[in-house]
Amino acid sequence: MSVSVFNRCWSKVILETLVRQGVSHVCIAPGSRSTPLTLEAVRLQNAGSVTCHTHFDERGLGFFALGIAKATQSPVAIIVTSGTATANLYPAIIEARQTGVNLFVLTADRPPELWECGANQAILQQNMFGQYPVANVNLPKPNADYSAQWLISLLEQAAFQQKQQGGVVHINVPFTEPLYDATDEEVNSHSWLQPLQRWLIQNKSWINVEVQQNEVLMHENWDHWRTKRGVVVVGQLPAEQAMGINSWASAMGWVLLTDIQSGVVPTTPYEDIWLANQTVREKLLQADIVIQFGARFISKRINQFLQAFKGEFWLVEQSGKALDPYHHSLTRFNAKAHHWLRAHPPLRQKPWLLEPLALSKFCATFIEQQVGGNLTEASLALRLPTLLPYNGVLFLGNSLLVRLVDALTQLPESYPVYTNRGASGIDGLLATAAGIGIGSNKPVVAVIGDTSTLYDLNSFALFKNVTQPTLIFVINNNGGAIFDMLPVDEQVKDQFYRLPHNGDFSQIAAMFDLKYAHPYTWADLNSVVKQAYSRRKATLIEIKTNPSDGSSLYKRLIDQISHAVIGA
């Protein structure tokens, strides 16, 4: 039996199984040991079953796949060769695990006889991602003693675990050489595949799992709790779940606190600012019940409120993950937000607390005055909605600007906002944004800090393949300005935290053949944005700001509002 042919047979079953689990995108890094998997992915692409994407940097590739999976809400497969290529996927795997994004990670491996004996490019790959995958599938090297039915069943069991929990399935696949010289005809006619002939021409799983949909029932004490003083807090949510929360909370007369990731239009905007007011915060803590939809809040003030609240606490979140870092004694509903709302009709009543609305109105005027008309981080955050396309998506990086956007920006209802707030790292942000563009096939606005951009420069190569207008805003405040918030000596802060780079991104844009613009005023920016939307390509828009302007304004807003005296 030809080893190279059977390697392909083994890979064929793996890839065909994943396609039947919803995979339509395969992200591939170059490498020799992964050749059997790569060639089968190419065959599936030629058959119209998948789209293959390539990238030379495995770390970026992992985040690119993450972005596609976020945008399509479907699992994505990743193929890499053996050795440290596999380890470079770790950051993306961590982020996927934290946020329940489904990835199938296929790591080619040397065969067991080459482990721990000094063989080239052989590292210990079994279970190498620890507890971060929802399932680790450590396959033997291809062997006809194992039936194809066994291989399918093993993979589908792992896929079922993924559907239940959300996250990564790691499939480690050792291959013995030779890896080449197998023709499609030799593979398709191999006797090992004969029991699968009917399955191979059908687009259905080997094991049919009937998942029972649990109906969301009204809480037995809802008639009691809906008469009380409540606060609705909304974190990161899929766009389709955001609809209706605002009107439901308004009908109840309850205070609504929203995260920029929620897709919910706030009734009292600028929560991250006005929650700094101690008088209002103390009144808010007198609520009888808090109902939280989603999780992973950006706002420090919302997090502080949640931590301080000691009353009745309900959490509505579909993933089943533990998403209460303050360990409330709570009632948990594993449900989608809109399903829960249907089961819990509102009781129409007047607002129980008027100060948030009054303070929010004061903030609107005060913030406009403080931000001014110059092109700065704060003005970009405040006026970001004017730059967004009607049918587009927004990706926010993990820098000072994401806090400013969360504090100052008001987006249209259910406008798609993507972030990497599982581990909130600065790695892979460009790659994730590129993946979201490919996966959504919509215009993208990505707003990323300069340090984050430097950390992921290789991923600019991924934007060559975008087919929709893509605007990459790089906020260049000469280093990690978010660290200005720390109570650290200025000299120490520069040397060990901010790390000024004193550079710009014009030559980087040229290197990756990207359109580049460096607007100085809002008039310049509006012109640049108009031109960028006329092209189905990526444009790098560098916004240079003074290092401390954004953080200073943010701190000033918080300080001024914290002492404001507002009558209801």
UniProtKB/Swiss-Prot annotation:
**Function per UniProt:** Catalyzes the thiamine diphosphate-dependent decarboxylation of 2-oxoglutarate and the subsequent addition of the resulting succinic semialdehyde-thiamine pyrophosphate anion to isochorismate to yield 2-succinyl-5-enolpyruvyl-6-hydroxy-3-cyclohexene-1-carboxylate (SEPHCHC).
Please give the catalytic activity noted in the UniProt record: isochorismate + 2-oxoglutarate + H(+) = 5-enolpyruvoyl-6-hydroxy-2-succinyl-cyclohex-3-ene-1-carboxylate + CO2
Keywords in alphabetical order, please. Answer: Magnesium, Manganese, Menaquinone biosynthesis, Metal-binding, Thiamine pyrophosphate, Transferase
Record keyword Magnesium present = yes
Please give the biological process terms from Gene Ontology that the record holds. Answer: menaquinone biosynthetic process
Q: Which cofactor does it need?
A: Mg(2+); Mn(2+); thiamine diphosphate
Q: What is this protein called?
A: 2-succinyl-5-enolpyruvyl-6-hydroxy-3-cyclohexene-1-carboxylate synthase
SUPFAM superfamilies linked = Thiamin diphosphate-binding fold (THDP-binding)
Q: How is the cofactor bound?
A: Binds 1 thiamine pyrophosphate per subunit.
Highest taxon of the lineage: Bacteria
Q: Which family does it belong to?
A: Belongs to the TPP enzyme family. MenD subfamily.
Q: Which Pfam families match?
A: TPP_enzyme_C, TPP_enzyme_M_2, TPP_enzyme_N
Enzyme Commission code: 2.2.1.9
Q: Which GO terms describe its molecular function?
A: 2-succinyl-5-enolpyruvyl-6-hydroxy-3-cyclohexene-1-carboxylic-acid synthase activity; magnesium ion binding; manganese ion binding; thiamine pyrophosphate binding
UniProt cross-references to InterPro entries, sorted A to Z: MenaQ_synth_MenD (IPR004433), MenD_middle (IPR032264), THDP-binding (IPR029061), Thiamin_PyroP_enz_TPP-bd_dom (IPR012001), TPP_enzyme_TPP-bd (IPR011766)
Copy the pathway line from the protein's UniProt record.
Quinol/quinone metabolism; 1,4-dihydroxy-2-naphthoate biosynthesis; 1,4-dihydroxy-2-naphthoate from chorismate: step 2/7; Quinol/quinone metabolism; menaquinone biosynthesis
Question: What does the record note on quaternary structure?
Answer: Homodimer.
Q: Which Gene3D superfamilies match?
A: 3.40.50.970, TPP-binding domain
